[in-house]
């Protein structure tokens, strides 16, 4: 029989782990572990991405092969990925198998073996393949460049490992020991009874997580920068403003007023420009207000980004006031159970309008046809 519950119990430490659970109809459950302050913004560039690829490999409890076969036999699906803020582990399975997958996730956080041969044989190939696939998108290149010029370090680090600087197994192991602690770990369960989840976590290796403090990464906001990248394929132009967390609400109102990516089909100005959207990228310590214009035709992008800049400059106080309800809806649409968005939209968000007097600009693609920032 498959082992469904860890034999050891560390219930006192488990009480420090942040748990959120909700029951749902049907026989399917999902369990997500979010490790905050463990994303690409933290540590050496690329180390978080490589750590995410070590997850679900060999650990002290069982081999990667055994876990893969067992989880497949149970019909489970597992994944591990990195964001700028966090490492996120996700599992999907039948409800009755909750103890097994709680145990598996706890083993990842506390018992991963970090064997030397896994780095060149499994981890590096997987990480490099993911980066190569992402780099095939000019939009990805543009957003990476925008983060780099807007934040430089931290949130400006590359999202994925690019092979520029070698990273050792010891460096990955050290990063894991600093990131995987009770202050950083949150568990979200859907289709899960909260009492059951607490019980199984208390009986699993989750309880072996050490106590720790959440380290904040210093954030610097830089404006007035420009980046141009010549690349084959479609063209992309980005206007971006790095913003403080306190300003998320007013930039959500501005986004709704000109045309938010979360509100397609509206009559907002950007909806009249081919390939144009706006959004607010929100992180724990800062964010980015972004206007994006993409098209296979660079001339269309050139015309579109100029029109988009004109549209945002033309937004009136009345437009912002009228957009507050739309902004509330956009925020609600962004909020997910595993990643709640805590931004309060009210009338005050429209009283101090967001400004685009200074901004960062990125052009990727056929840059011979794309305008410079001072031409917008």
Curated annotation (Swiss-Prot):
User: Which UniProt keywords are listed?
Assistant: Electron transport, Membrane, Mitochondrion, Mitochondrion inner membrane, Respiratory chain, Transit peptide, Transport
Gene Ontology MF annotations: metal ion binding; ubiquinol-cytochrome-c reductase activity
A GO biological process held by the record: mitochondrial electron transport, ubiquinol to cytochrome c
Q: What is its main location?
A: mitochondrion
Transit peptide: first to last position: 1-16
Please verify whether the record's keywords include Hydrolase: no
Biological role stated in the UniProt entry = Component of the ubiquinol-cytochrome c oxidoreductase, a multisubunit transmembrane complex that is part of the mitochondrial electron transport chain which drives oxidative phosphorylation.
Q: Which family does it belong to?
A: Belongs to the peptidase M16 family. UQCRC2/QCR2 subfamily.
Protein name as it appears in the record: Cytochrome b-c1 complex subunit 2, mitochondrial
Native species of this protein?
Debaryomyces hansenii (strain ATCC 36239 / CBS 767 / BCRC 21394 / JCM 1990 / NBRC 0083 / IGC 2968)
Gene name of the record: QCR2
